[in-house]
């Protein structure tokens, strides 16, 4: 731990860059049979503020996704430059639901804005780490509890964000995505029961 950063526990910050070369030979996603030698670049930067303004918290995440040296036109699987993939405000109440049997605080979190997250172990809702661009949504999300608790409930009402290659991404105003995922961990240290609804 660095002395200069000791009092910055309220600030989360990170930067990430990935460069990937792909040899796509007879790609099944294309209607032409040829070999493509593509370079995919993805840069992310994240800033989050917590604790210092509690119960208010916020986060902003930027992503720049580009692909070069392809025989095919740009598409939104590989190309989405200068985009905000997350920008949300959060109300965080650490002990709103008391403590669980393990002594952990059971918080209540209410978020609003643009978000990207994963649910049900990425099987039904994932931000697709392999693809060069990211799935995200705009709307509201409420979480009762946290991962260290013996139970947790995550519920949301969102509109999908449509990735636009040439303009700032916007939400699909005609489409809503609702859901809830429960996490029941009381009976076992190695097993979690996850009932869910999505529609």
Named regions from a protein language model:
Residues 77-84, 91, 104, 119-122, ...:
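Outer-membrane pore/translocation modules
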